[in-house]
């Protein structure tokens, strides 16, 4: 029980239950922490971490950059792909009675 804050007691199911307070009925009895200053951490502030480029990363073994460019590059960027629609198949329900 010494691991928990003094305003909490350990329940049988190992969850923290607030003790009843007879002096106040507001949210302060639950010891709700105040909003902390939400600044970015040191790692998030470091622009070198945020602005890493693909070229700076270590490539995989056997990675061929030219082959990757050929596979991922659109053949004609001005004209988007035109996907052909297949006609929808008509399924009949087994409960339908054909006359």
From Swiss-Prot:
It comes from the Eukaryota. Residues 1-99 are annotated as: Disordered. Residues 19-29 have a biased composition (Polar residues). This is Uncharacterized protein C569.09. It comes from Schizosaccharomyces pombe (strain 972 / ATCC 24843). The lineage of its organism: Eukaryota, Fungi, Dikarya, Ascomycota, Taphrinomycotina.
